[in-house]
Swiss-Prot record:
It catalyses: 2'-deoxyribonucleotide-(2'-deoxyribose 5'-phosphate)-2'-deoxyribonucleotide-DNA = a 3'-end 2'-deoxyribonucleotide-(2,3-dehydro-2,3-deoxyribose 5'-phosphate)-DNA + a 5'-end 5'-phospho-2'-deoxyribonucleoside-DNA + H(+). It comes from the Bacteria. Belongs to the FPG family. The active site is at P2 (schiff-base intermediate with dna), E3 (proton donor), K53 (proton donor), R253 (proton donor). This is Endonuclease 8. It comes from Escherichia coli O7:K1 (strain IAI39 / ExPEC).
Amino acid sequence: MPEGPEIRRAADNLEAAIKGKPLTDVWFAFPQLKSYQSQLIGQHVTHVETRGKALLTHFSNELTLYSHNQLYGVWRVVDTGEEPQTTRVLRVKLQTADKTILLYSASDIEMLTPEQLTTHPFLQRVGPDVLDPNLTPEVVKERLLSPRFRNRQFAGLLLDQAFLAGLGNYLRVEILWQVGLTGNHKAKDLNAAQLDALAHALLDIPRLSYATRGQVDENKHHGALFRFKVFHRDGELCERCGGIIEKTTLSSRPFYWCPGCQH
């Protein structure tokens, strides 16, 4: 499943295609959304927001399209009039004079009023988004030490969208390697330096991935361009200590780590 950085880059692509342009055609597959088609003609997308792995498309009439791609959903940008050859099932079409965005295969799609936006179950449940520029390491540290999260093992905590939205498996693996911790650690057992390093890594690594992944220079480290240090690198040498990277399973997901320097 795509993680926060990939969802945000997808949102950027959608914004670049149709933001601010009047909608000339709107189509929804689901019957409960059909009544909104005419309401959106002539309106425009004001911005596309991400909340972890959910995407919120905001319109100028204050309606918001909520979509969660889950495992199979995917957005596509095409020139208006183009019909992609695909076996995927079309769910949403938002068309402007020159560009059209299409959502395929997703099943979790709703239209929300401003009031519903504040009470939506998923949006109420998710924690702060790691790509939110207003989220600080200090706030992350407070969440780590809160009664709700301080006794949780990182193996599960870093996959829990209620803790921080936008994290996923590759980020979990890379963050824990960066700070030299294992999935079995808990926030309550860390010293001040470890807590500080983890709070920064929980923001720095997702943001670096968002900014630079896809522009990878294999000779660069986390401080420059993003590349995987341990994810999918089992059997290779750890660049930090020379140990052998291993693969196991934690919280039902593949987990990669270096026993030589993560302890």
